[in-house]
A protein has these predicted regions:
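Intrinsically disordered, low-complexity non-transmembrane regions of multi-pass membrane transporters
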Residues: 1-38, 72-73, 78, 194-216, ...
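Hydrophobic transmembrane alpha-helices of secondary-active transporters
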Residues: 60-73, 79-109, 249-259, 271-297
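Core mid-bundle transmembrane helix pairs that form the ion/substrate translocation pathway
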Residues: 40-41, 197-260
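Entry/N-cap segments of selected transmembrane alpha helices
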Residues: 32-41, 88, 99-131, 219, ...
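C-terminal transmembrane helix pair
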Residues: 182-186, 312-391
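Flexible hinge motifs at transmembrane-helix junctions and intramembrane kinks/re-entrant loops
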Residues: 43-62, 66, 70-84, 231-245, ...
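Structural signature of hydrophobic alpha-helical transmembrane segments
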Residues: 49-65, 85-89, 111-122, 144-148, ...
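Alpha-helical membrane segments and immediately flanking helix-loop junctions
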Residues: 136-178, 328-367
């Protein structure tokens, strides 16, 4: 009996999912490139009217809003805010701030109880404001709390999506709060210090050309180490890992290098371009949340503005308490207790060269406390929600 065996090759089906992911990644890169390209002239234009070290954040906010709105209006394409760009921006800013801290953060360790008290006060106020907002807007308590507790636009919106809550509303209130703080506090600081404002606006020409080739290898090394540390911090879910990890690298990089026996006396500082890019990315991601907003009614916007106003009032009360409990001046207290925009507020203190160590420690304590306590907050909010539904 003759038997013939035929072997049919098994053809792998094309991975449409991988192709879609690649296309999405390319679209995100193109959008980010356009935003950066637009943020440059906007930052330069703002620098003509506003002398300060964080104009690139404002340029990024405008660029992110305009580009995403343009995608929606002209191409009927609604890209989501780029959270990866936010992480990279936080890492760049953390690296810049860390390398600029000449003092020792342990010198302000005695103030940690004050920082913890102020953080708990702001969290308690955020909970009360969230309850009031939920009653006014007739929304569930979990959505209201996620919208009003200072914890970052991206983080709170992502949690709202995980629990099937009103993501656009959470992002709206958080974006209003962060934008208001980021735009208002620098102008208050500039007005208060007057001629003592340190004009650290970073010209593009200086940022691009002020690259010391002898330190280019060190720049690549520090970026590689920062990327590794930030990746591990995010992987192990360390609170505010992208900012905190880069900050530690910025503080300790020179000391670690000088401890090596085969390395001489080295003092490395990241070039201004890193600061410019970090500020742009922070601003762009804030602006993207504005460009991504659907249409809200006047009543919804009114309630959102009321909750933000209450949050700002709570921050002002916390600043007054800090003035009574410490020897800090009022500007330091204002920067420490500003409800949101931690990296941006530290940048303001850096531009002013005003108690950078105190402001940095205060915001780090708050970031760690808020992110570490999120599971407890979520448990309580969901429990209160279920009880209210039963009643």
């Amino acid at each position: 009996m003759n038997q013939s065996i035929s072997i049919t090759p098994v053809l792998e089906e094309p991975t449409h999912q991988d192709t879609a992911v690649a296309k999405l990644f390319i679209k995100q890169l193109i959008i980010l490139f356009l935003e950066m390209l637009l943020a440059l002239p906007l930052g330069l234009l703002l620098a003509k009217f506003y002398t300060g070290g964080i104009v690139w954040i404002f340029g990024g906010i405008a660029a992110g809003t305009l580009v995403l709105q343009g995608c929606r209006l002209f191409y009927q394409y609604s890209p989501k805010p780029n959270r990866t760009a936010r992480k990279v921006g936080m890492a760049f800013v953390g690296l810049t701030i860390g390398s600029s801290i000449h003092g020792n953060l342990t010198s302000v360790a005695s103030g940690i109880p004050i920082f913890i008290f102020l953080t708990l006060f702001l969290l308690l106020c955020g909970g009360c404001i969230g309850y009031i907002y939920s009653r006014m807007s007739q929304t569930n308590l979990l959505t209201a709390m996620l919208a009003t507790v200072p914890g970052g636009v991206g983080i709170m919106a992502a949690i709202a999506a995980d629990y099937n809550r009103n993501v656009p509303l959470v992002a709206l209130v958080q974006a209003i709060r962060v934008t208001t703080v980021v735009l208002t506090i620098p102008f208050i600081a500039r007005t208060s210090v007057g001629n003592y404002w340190n004009p650290q606006t970073l010209p593009v020409k200086s940022a691009l050309l002020n690259l010391d080739l002898s330190q280019l290898k060190l720049l690549l090394l520090v970026l590689l180490v920062t990327g590794l540390v930030v990746y591990l911090a995010i992987l192990f879910k360390i609170p505010a890992g992208d900012f905190f990890g880069a900050l530690l690298i910025g503080i300790g990089f020179n000391s670690l290098l000088n401890c090596l026996p085969f390395v001489g006396d080295i003092h490395f500082s990241p070039p201004p371009l890193i600061n410019v890019l970090g500020q742009m990315l922070l601003g762009i991601t804030i602006g993207e949340y504005w460009g991504d907003k659907p249409t809200f009614g006047k009543q919804t916007l009114g309630y959102a503005l009321m909750s933000v106003a209450m949050t700002l009032a709570a921050g002002a009360i916390a600043a007054i308490l800090a003035m009574q409990l410490t020897s800090w001046d009022w500007l330091t207290c204002l920067l420490v207790t500003a409800p949101g925009g931690s990296a941006e507020m530290i940048l303001v203190s850096l531009a002013l060269n005003h108690n950078v160590e105190i402001v940095t420690t205060g915001h780090l304590v708050r970031l760690i406390a808020i992110n570490s306590s999120l599971p407890l907050w979520l448990f309580l909010f969901r429990r209160f929600d279920s009880q209210s539904e039963l009643s």
